Amino acid sequence: MSENTRSDTHSETYAELAAVGPYGVRPGHALITMVEPRPGHEYAYNRWYEDDHFYAGAMAMPWMSAGRRWVATRDLQLLRLPEKSAVAQPVTAGCYLTTYWVTDGRYDDHMKWTVAINKRLNRDGRVYRDRTHVFTAFQDHEATVYRDGAAGPRDFHALDHPYAGLVLEVVDAESPEQRAELLEWLVSRHLPKRVAGSPAAMVTVFRPTPLPGDRMTYVKQVEGVDTRLTLLWFLEADPRECWDPYFTGLDAAVTEAGLGRVELLAPFVPTIPGTDKYVDQLR
């Protein structure tokens, strides 16, 4: 590498950055993004995201330690609850979900890079326009509930472990104070009971954070930053096989507790990277 190139890319700075700050393995933060390609653009969107954006717009960035992409075919979309959702209108919108882990304590550092790199990608014509962000937010990790205690994969393994499915759950409380009560109830009572003997190996719980003011304009500002919780259920079975016994009625259980309301319960299966599998099953 020439001296000019090293100077242009600030190569010497990387050694300084690597020597300071948190560098654990826990997912202290997440990017959770549910997107709907516009009709007729399904194949092109899928190839753009998998061949370019998943890497250049996410995984190549500092402190983003893991990523996994998920898809909801039409039959999975039709399982979603509730019929009228504050998150997705219609509730079937958002057939692709991508989840990323960000190293604990590195949120601010990562955000500076992600805003800059996405502006660069946009300037260079590497942003696909024919898509809608249905639910996109960076999130702070609150808790993880494990079915099998200390045995099995941890949350930092979750996006690399070959789970057969994932369920995205979004719960809204009425106030910040009620959200704290909701979190306590979920972690200490509701989730341990739900995962016991179920195909769900773990549930991670996050709270959304506001996007920076200089974010890309095609991503709307995050709603519910003081009142919302986002849950990811990692399943060892196809969600179609376990939906009725384990997830039907889950929204009613939250409502009955009087601590919030489920605004989205949506099942997904993992994509097969580098392929167009499932694209013909979205509509």
For every predicted segment, state its role.
Residues 2-283:
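Macromolecular interaction modules
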